[in-house]
Amino acid sequence: MMIILASSSPRRREILGRFFEIKVYPANVEERSTVKDSREKSLDIARKKALSVSSKFPGATIVAADTMVIFRGKTLGKPRNAEEARKMLRALSGNVHKVITGYCIIHNGRIIEGVEETEVKFREIGDELLEWYISTGEWKDKAGAYGIQGYASIFVEWIKGDYYNVVGLPIKVVVELTKLGFKPKR
């Protein structure tokens, strides 16, 4: 049995690869959805990713996910530049936001899917610290302009829920794979 991660995310690769031997084949799909609800939207995108890769690897188990940061009802995507990153982080400063990940596993023609939601509270971020963080470039290619596992960990006052969800792949996905008979590596 082979697990294919339908993602180019190094964070998802690291989480899943910690437990299982995997192959990576990024899904080439538009990360957009006409669905309005954030939870349903992340699930819809994850499902599209999984289905697009499953046709190329019959018999393999496919894992796909889509993570979004939601603040005051708005989705914060990946910033296009430093100024967008700065605006996002200023908005999150001192506030609570949600990180939502939709995931989809395709195994033997069966679809297992779900949505994980984690609340994150940021401390107040001063201008000097914000500018230092922007200069690191860590905000690039990250929803909400931060990676909790990196330098941005100093922004976090608390989280309620699954830490790995905030990184990009809920640990529940690992549990689901073990239920399907995959054994974690040693």
From Swiss-Prot:
Phylogenetic classification of the source organism: Archaea, Methanobacteriati, Methanobacteriota, Thermococci, Thermococcales
Locations listed in the record: Cytoplasm
NCBIfam families for this protein: maf
GO CC entries: cytoplasm
Reactions performed catalytically: dTTP + H2O = dTMP + diphosphate + H(+); UTP + H2O = UMP + diphosphate + H(+)
Protein name: dTTP/UTP pyrophosphatase
Entry cofactors: a divalent metal cation
UniProt site (Important for substrate specificity): 11, 67, 149
GO-annotated biological processes: nucleotide metabolic process
Function: Nucleoside triphosphate pyrophosphatase that hydrolyzes dTTP and UTP. May have a dual role in cell division arrest and in preventing the incorporation of modified nucleotides into cellular nucleic acids.
Primary localisation category: cytoplasm
Family: Belongs to the Maf family. YhdE subfamily.
UniProt entry tagged with the keyword Cytoplasm: yes
Bridged cysteine pairs (disulfide): none
Active-site positions on this chain: 66 (proton acceptor)
Record keywords: Cytoplasm, Hydrolase, Nucleotide metabolism
Gene Ontology MF annotations: dTTP diphosphatase activity; UTP diphosphatase activity
Keyword Cell inner membrane belongs to the record: no
Enzyme Commission code(s) on record: 3.6.1.9
InterPro entries named in the record: ITPase-like_fam (IPR029001), Maf-like (IPR003697)
